[in-house]
Amino acid sequence: MEKKSIIAVVAILLILVTILIAGMMGQNDVLRVSDKNVIAFNDMMGDLKKADIVFIGEVHDFPEHHRMELEVIRAFHESGRPLAIGLEMFRKDSQKELDSWVQGASSLAQFLPVYYDNWHQPWPRYRDILLYAREHRVPLIGLNIPDAISETVARHGFASLNAAQKKQLPPGISCDVDPAYREFIRKAYADHQQEPDKKFLYFCEAQMVWDKAMAWRLIEYLKQDPGRTVVVLAGVGHAWKRGIPGQVARQSPFTSRVVIPLIPDQIGIDSVTKQDGDYVMLQ
C-alpha cells in the first residue's frame, strides 16, 4: 500500500475514534450521587421525568452551565411532557412581560430592557434558553423578589423590613438561620467566609428569604397547573437541596430532583453527597 494511502487510512481511523470518544463522553457525563456511578444523560432524564420540579444549579457566568440547562429543557420538551421554566433571574412582578415574550407579543427590542432590569448577566448567556422558550411557547415563571427587599435584608437583617416590604413576601414567612444552614451558605459562597459574624448572618438571612419566597412561588404555580413539570434555573446556592428544594419539601407534597454542576473546590465527585443533589453534570 502506498504511503499516501496508509496516511489517509490512519487519518480516517483517527477521525472515527474521535467521533466515538466524543459520543461516549456525551452519553456518560452524569454522576448519579446515590451510588457515585457515571450514567448516560438519557438515564438521568428518565428519573428527572418522575419529579414535579427539577432544579438545575448554575454558576451564572459559566456558559457550559447554560448549555447543560438547555439540554435538559430540550429533552423535556421533545418528550412531549408539559413544561415550564422557573427563573431566579426574573422577579415575580415581571410575569406579565415574561408572558408577553413567550407568546410572541413583544419584540426583542422591547424585552431586552426587561431582561436587564431584572438581571445583571449579559444577554448572550441566557439568549438561547429564552429564545427556545419563545419558539416553543414554554411558559417562563419569574420567581424572584424585589431587589430592595433582598438588599435590605443582606445589609440590615430580616428584622429591619417594614410592614410594606413584608407584604411583598409570602404570607407567614420567617427567617430562622440555624447552624447547619450557615455552614451550607459558607460552603456555597466561599467569597463570604471571612465576613464579620453579624454581616454574614444577614447574608444568610437574605439567602433564606430568597429560598422561601421562590419555593412559595413554585408551589403556588404547581397548585394551579399540577400536570406540568417545572425546570428551575438558579444559582447553585439556591438550587442545592438545602436551598429552594428543601423549602419546597417542607411546604408541599411536590417532588423534586436536583442537578448541580461540577465546581472545583466546592462540588467534587468525592465530596458531593445526597444532601447536596441527585446528579452532577461532569461536562
Name the predicted role of every residue range.
Residues E2-L13:
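N-terminal Sec-pathway targeting helices
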Residues T18-A51:
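N- or domain-start disorder-to-order transition segments that initiate the globular core
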Residues K49-G57, A109-V114:
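Acidic/histidine-rich, surface-exposed loop or edge segments in extracytoplasmic proteins
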Residues V59-P63, F90-S94, P146-S150, V236-A239, ...:
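Solvent-exposed loop/turn segments at secondary-structure junctions
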Residues F62-H66, F76, P82-A84, K92-V102:
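Membrane-embedded segments
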Residues A84-F90, V258-L262:
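Short internal beta-strands
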Residues K96-Y221:
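A substrate-binding/cap region within the structured catalytic cores of diverse enzymes
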Residues A213-W216, Y221-L222, R228-V231, V236-Q283:
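C-terminal regions of proteins
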